[in-house]
Design a protein with these regions (language model features):
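Structural signature of hydrophobic alpha-helical transmembrane segments
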Residues: 12-26, 79-83, 136-141, 192-207, ...
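Hydrophobic mid-bilayer segments of alpha-helices in multi-pass membrane transport proteins
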Residues: 23-33, 40-62, 84-90, 230, ...
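Juxtamembrane helix-boundary/capping and inter-helix hinge elements in multi-pass membrane proteins
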Residues: 98-102, 115-116, 149-158, 185-192, ...
Length: 550
């Protein structure tokens, strides 16, 4: 039932779409100013941005204060569950590995494959990170891989920044294809067409990201020295991603591509190694890194093997069925409800937006899968209770402020979405006519920056992209895919992602440094993707699949 209080979103509160867009951009500008100029901590910048967004929503958009408050609570809760929950569980698992001594063996095992930091970043940040993105998403891959790379000797800022950049190519198919499947259901277009177009558009990005990572670490010299290994990783990933996205759908491209790339690169490194070993730490002697016993290596990697097993189980339909309505574990669901104002917000088309959310404690929650992996690790490795208590205490202490930052950032995203500010920004770009082919991925980029999620950006702007395609007589699949592809390079500058990465590597309070590191690359990538979209639209329309309505 709709509440007595009603608010219909405004797309153009000032009577000029571009002036309204400038106003809607004000909270984002404020956030950038806080981080880049005033160098405030993440939670401080997030708090100020929420205040500015609330003022704009109340005075310019006319959104009632009670609905602004409900949007804040909804967003903050979403930030805590599942996002912060995933990060806390992931860091706890990592700390168990470190404090139990397993991580030292993991480092040794990676060193036996290659002691070269450039290739280690490709194996862990790009390949393993892509697998985790395909399985869990929500920032977990960056948290886990960045922490692993710091343990292997990379500086925290390097590890966090490089993992954020590596976590671009797989984002569109993250969390078992949810970004594309969700958009498909919303706009009424078969997911296979969108998945295929995304796979085709991602080819240049997926192929170039591993080389770009090495270039950032060691320049042109590094690319030349590691070229064979990086080519194997990039080609095997890109080809598999292209084939799987075009023939298998949206669910498996990340997982399959990551496994194939990791296997191909590891096997290749058995027969080839770079002439010069590159390290970002002071380690010079690699002679003591001899072959380790299989049992010892297996035991050390067991926490992450259990992580993979638990994630696979958690994604299975038969497992999820236990938590369906009326099933045996249905009681684990908790609803965050605003019954008195539910249905009070409607978009410009008159469709009601939900202010309620179901907090599913077990099913569909990757954080719970990671926690179960941690508990199984404690059992199988027989980790002493004092070590467990120390790991848990350190995790909760270190994650407290980052979790607040994440909550504030997602709260801002919900205020912007529910008030109509996000739609204002997208609508302004949609007025650019033929130039929209360039701005289509930019809208997705802005959407992911605002929400921290490619799924949210696709749900937010998918209908707008579809409408623009229809009005410009462009195949819908192109702009729908461009929204998702543009979004993947917005992930590295999303305040949510920045907060997660900083928390994982111990850079809490240094969010501005990491943001400056990734911003210029994100802008460069989105410009290139915009140009690539124009090339497809005007010169290569034949590669766009024919859209089939659902």
């Amino acid at each position: 039932m709709k509440g007595a209080l009603m608010y219909q979103q405004l797309t153009d509160p000032l009577g000029s779409i571009w002036l309204s867009a400038l106003l809607a951009f004000l909270p984002i500008f404020c956030f950038l100013l806080c981080l880049l100029v005033f160098k405030l901590k993440g939670y401080q910048a997030g708090f100020i941005t929420v205040i500015v967004a609330s003022v704009v929503a109340f005075y310019a958009y006319g959104m009632p204060f009670s609905l602004i408050g409900a949007s804040f609570v909804q967003g903050f809760a979403q930030g805590m569950w599942p996002i912060a929950w995933i990060i806390i569980a992931a860091i706890f698992l990592y700390k168990l590995s470190v404090k139990s001594g397993s991580f030292e063996v993991i480092k040794e095992s990676v060193m036996t494959i290659t002691p070269d930091h450039r290739i280690q970043v490709i194996l862990i940040g790009f390949c393993f990170g892509s697998f985790l993105e395909g399985a869990i998403g929500f920032g977990g891959p960056v948290a886990i891989t960045a922490a692993l790379l710091v343990g292997l000797g990379l500086k925290p800022l390097h590890a966090a920044g490089l993992c954020l950049i590596a976590n671009t190519a797989p984002v569109a198919f993250g969390a078992v294809g949810i970004p594309i499947i969700a958009m498909s259901n919303l706009v009424g277009v078969e997911q296979y067409e969108i998945s295929a177009m995304v796979g085709r558009m991602l080819v240049p990005l997926s192929l170039s990201v591993p080389f770009f990572i090495v270039f950032l670490m060691d320049g042109v010299k590094g690319v030349k020295e590691t070229f064979p290994a990086v080519l194997v990783a990039a080609l095997s990933f890109t080809i598999t991603q292209f084939i799987s996205s075009n023939y298998l759908g949206a669910e498996l491209p990340d997982i399959v591509s990551a496994v194939v790339s990791l296997a191909c690169t590891t096997i290749f490194l058995k027969f080839w190694s770079p002439k010069n070993i590159f390290r970002l730490d002071d380690l010079k002697d690699f002679s003591h890194h001899t072959q380790l016993e299989f049992g010892k290596v297996f035991k050390a990697w067991l926490p992450f093997i259990l992580l993979i097993v638990c994630i696979i189980v958690w994604t299975q339909p038969w497992f999820k069925a236990f938590f369906d309505k009326g099933a045996v574990f249905d009681y684990t669901k908790v609803a965050l409800s605003f019954n008195n104002i539910e249905g009070s917000i409607v978009d410009s088309a008159g469709k009601a937006l939900s202010l309620n959310m179901d907090i599913n404690l077990i099913a569909l929650q990757a954080g719970t899968a990671i926690l179960v992996a941690a508990l199984l690790t404690i059992f199988f490795l027989r980790i002493k209770s004092n070590i467990v208590e120390e790991a848990l205490g350190d995790t909760l202490k270190e994650m407290a402020m980052p979790c607040i930052t994440i909550g504030l950032v997602v709260a801002f995203a919900f205020i912007a979405k529910n008030s109509g500010m996000s739609t204002t920004l997208g609508t302004a770009f949609a007025t650019t006519g033929d130039a929209f082919s360039f701005f289509s991925p930019v809208i997705g980029w802005i959407g992911v920056f605002l929400t921290g999620s490619d799924t949210s950006a696709n749900l937010l702007f998918g209908p707008l992209q579809q409408a623009a395609a229809t009005s410009l007589a462009v195949p819908e699949a192109l702009f729908l895919a461009a929204n998702s592809v543009g979004g993947v390079v917005g992930k590295m500058i999303s305040p949510q992602s920045i907060a997660i990465a900083c928390a994982a590597v111990g850079l809490v309070g240094k969010e501005s440094d990491l943001f400056k590191f990734t911003l210029k690359y994100s802008v460069g990538f989105i410009i290139l993707i915009g140009i690539w979209t124009c090339i497809i639209a005007f010169l290569m329309p034949g590669i766009i699949p024919e859209v089939i309505a659902k």
